[in-house]
Amino acid sequence: MARQFSLEKTRNIGIIAHIDAGKTTTTERILFHTGKIHKIGETHDGASQMDWMEQEQERGITITSAATTAFWKDHRINIIDTPGHVDFTVEVSRSLRVLDGAVTVIDAQAGVEPQTETVWRQASEYKVPRVIFVNKMDKVGADFAYAIETLKQRLGVHASAIQWPIGSENDFNGIIDLVEMNAFEYDNTSPETGKVVPIPSDLESITQTKRNELIETLSTLDEELMMYYLEEKPISSEMLKNSIRKATLQASFFPVLCGSSFKNKGVVKMLDAIVDYLPAPCDVAAIVGFDSDNQEIVRTGLDEEPFIALAFKVMTDPYVGKLTFFRIYSGSVKAGSYVTNTTKGTKERFGRLLQMHANSREEVKEAYTGDILAVVGLKATTTGDTLASEGQTIVLESMNFPEPVIEIAVEPKTKADQDKMGIALAKLAEEDPTFKVFSNHETGQTIIAGMGELHLDIIIERLKREFKVQANVTEPQVAYRETITQETETEGKFIRQSGGRGQYGHVWMRFEPNPGKGFEFVNKIVGGVVPREYVPAVQKGIQEALAGGILAGYQIIDVKATLFDGSYHDVDSSEMAFKIAASMALKETKTKGNPVILEPIMDVEVVTPNDYVGNVIGDLTSRRGRLENQESRANAVAIRAFVPLSEMFGYATVLRSNTQGRATFIMQFAKYEKAPKSITEEIIKKRA
């Protein structure tokens, strides 16, 4: 089957934003205007097409990223709608990894919010070009100029309006196009069926000012435009459009649009901007990977190149089983083909190829460069794996995910539940790289860990609904960590010799703090005092011991371990003996490495009316919070603080009480920090 849409006319985009900025509503309107759906569903009514999970429809939030394909002006647009809640940022991260462009939706009243900053940072890591849609222009307190100012102040980016609103709040009824220099006035009885009109006379002055600001910003990035501007030559709309596209593709400039998705205003103009300014797969840089010898391989995005793709999401479907979502970077693939998972070195067979629309699907026989699809039948492939045609060894850069910060114990209610629970949890962990399952070696309990209380609530709900597993859960616990703060050299010696073959393993290790870099192992053995075949056992012994901790049984992180000496026995040495010796050497750091307990610190932002600022600050301080800043925001004050996670359980109820239900808050993991002595002693005592 031949390709239906050229690469130039394909767009792979994501919709990203802070929670409640209107991402899913925006996506619904896009689908409506492109003819993909014929009846609009509302998120707050639980009728959204893109929020298809039961929990999403009940809670009115997006939990997973849903994929769909729409068509506009002879272009195919693959869209991924992502969650805004901080507990589900992994969905945003893995979507951005495979997208070429994004629409960032921000609230016209709130401007840039904490999760906007997080998703913006994630998009910047992957160098994703973006257009910005200032939504909810009909909302009380909407202020387009303020929203743009927050983009510059909080994100520090070159962002300029390419549109200007006609009115705001209830009077928002049109948009001025600063590129074409005309206006579009909406017919409020049937939005988006308005007409092009001259720019209102009372807005001519600000329109010219804003167009000049746009040109000034772009001229710092575009030499040709700068010459025209300095020489006061007329700048055509075509020239301005080309300059916007060029700067947007380089992610050095971000055009700002306005509208109200709920009222159906500005969405068609945004679709035009997606086609005009966001990149096609052939506009982005060639994909770079590495072969088995760690040599760089560059692949251009052409159908004629060998097939290479990245798996970015795995999910369990009740009808077809395991679905693997992937993005093709070069070449093409047919249903039924055999491919290599070059990350794991395994062979996989592609079953059915599916074009997804939220949770419905359309089968296709062949897929090409730039396509985002799902495939049935992959056995070993997980998130971040590279898939390539047979004979290739190229591996693309994978994805890094944050470690969980909160954990609970789950206990099956019956024997039947016990049998099902292990399988269900394994499937859920396969879908979500930030969800971890492990056993507490002391109590034998099954522990599940995630990014927040909502994250784990959803997991427990899915256990019950999708897998029919009934389970009891404990109160949430903080996922503390341990580390050492002092460099030390320790000896580990394991000798058992009592007739017959014994055990002999002997190592000298140097352990040193490795802040923010995780675990690192270095082999500095000279002269074979520890034979090469036992070195992996030493590394494994240390890694296993790290998981069990040295102070209170919490995982040890950020440690560099160097094997520099030791000895062996020709007959009695074994991998097991060296593993045990290595773990003994690590345990010695309890007395020599000045170990400490680390606690997760959360970045908390509370938005409260002025009347309650004192209450909120006093309460945060009592929770060991460190105030970072506070700023006025519309008719409220935004207070930002770093607070230990252990102090934040039940905070929503207290905040409601302290502010008569008028404040909101959001928190996300910021970093691990050394716990105070009193807290450390309390933790050790509790775990003893």
From Swiss-Prot:
Signal peptide: none annotated. This is Elongation factor G. Pfam families: EF-G_D2, EFG_C, EFG_III, EFG_IV, GTP_EFTU. Keywords: Cytoplasm, Elongation factor, GTP-binding, Nucleotide-binding, Protein biosynthesis. The lineage of its organism: Bacteria, Bacillati, Mycoplasmatota, Mollicutes, Acholeplasmatales. GO terms for cellular component: cytoplasm. Residues 8-282 form the tr-type G domain. The keyword Protein biosynthesis applies. The keyword Ion transport does not apply. The gene is fusA. Belongs to the TRAFAC class translation factor GTPase superfamily. Classic translation factor GTPase family. EF-G/EF-2 subfamily. GO terms for biological process: ribosome disassembly. It is found in: Cytoplasm.
